Amino acid sequence: MDYESIKKHAKAVSEQVLTVRRTIHSRPELSFEEHETADYIAAQLTEAGILFRRIAGTGILARIEGHGDLQRCVVLRADTDALPIWEETGLECASRHDGVMHACGHDMHTACLLGALLVLNRHKSEIAGTVFGLFQ
């Protein structure tokens, strides 16, 4: 896995990551209520051919298997919940849910984790072990 190849693939998914962030930002959900968010993430993972399973109601555990000892693993994690705050930014992607807002960056954490998984999935033959992505 060389830097230039990773950089190229990251650039290739950058618009998708921005779209994911804006979509999630506009549809915030409080802790343990992130059903729409989980469905959206699941659809993105399915489209990319990344294996995953739903866990704990609104969580998702994605899995990218490389080669060699698959017991060797790393877990990348992102929060998916929003806060009970009114958004008054006037942004095009502002919250559509009254009194709930992604005010602490969890929408970006989620989008970046998805982006990382998209890039790593393209390089899975070069990964010695397993990469998990936990959307929580």
Locate predicted features.
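Acidic/His- and Gly-rich active-site-bordering loop/insert found
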Residues: 2-102, 111-114, 118-129
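Divalent metal-dependent hydrolysis catalytic cores, especially in the metallo-beta-lactamase
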Residues: 130-136
